[in-house]
């Protein structure tokens, strides 16, 4: 569990340093499909490690990054949110308490000039963490609301 959360946190922080972008019209995994509208790019291929899958997307004009991670953790959405936000706080982030949003949970965070929001969902076997960071959280929310097509609706939030 700690390795999966560390992997997720490392990828989230690593994306802040990522400057290259590869164009992609669609991101497709076993868990979701995400169509990328104009301005959005997939900064690197979907990554898989230790059973976790992560897609990293960015919009340079909006200065916004979105990550979608699915991990094999048998936790509730609330427990996933609580543990992740606690780990982020220990790493120096300012974090909010997890807030229920339907069957999912969300939490806001910031560190120095970086602000973001994460959405946590679970289906009993897998957990997902969707994070939006950057200058325009609304741009990331719109991308997800309009373009995310989950394979399992329980694994993703119903609203952003």
What do the predicted segments below correspond to?
Residues 8-19:
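Bacterial N-terminal signal peptides
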Residues 9-11, 32-37, 63, 68:
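Short N-terminal leader segment in a subset of presequences, especially plant chloroplast
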Residues 1-7:
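Positively charged n-region of N-terminal signal peptides that target proteins for export
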Residues 40-41, 85-88, 131-160:
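Surface-exposed amphipathic alpha-helical segments
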Residues 24-49, 99, 148-160:
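N-terminal "mature-domain start" segment
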Residues 45-127, 135-142:
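Conserved polar/disulfide-associated segments of primarily extracytoplasmic proteins
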């Amino acid at each position: 569990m700690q390795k999966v959360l560390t992997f997720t946190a490392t990828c989230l922080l690593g994306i802040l340093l990522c400057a290259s972008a590869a164009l992609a019209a669609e991101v497709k995994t076993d868990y979701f499909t995400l169509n990328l509208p104009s301005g959005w790019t997939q900064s690197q291929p979907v990554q898989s490690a230790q059973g976790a899958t992560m897609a990293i997307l960015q919009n340079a004009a909006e200065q916004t990054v979105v990550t979608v991670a699915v991990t094999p953790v048998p936790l509730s959405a609330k427990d996933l949110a609580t543990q992740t936000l606690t780990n982020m706080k220990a790493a120096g982030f300012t974090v909010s308490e997890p807030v229920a949003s339907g069957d999912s949970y969300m939490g806001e965070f910031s560190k120095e000039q970086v602000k973001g929001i994460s959405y946590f969902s679970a289906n009993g076997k897998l957990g997902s963490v969707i994070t939006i960071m950057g200058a325009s959280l609304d741009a990331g929310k719109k991308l997800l609301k309009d373009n995310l097509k989950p394979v399992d609706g329980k694994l993703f939030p119903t609203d952003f």
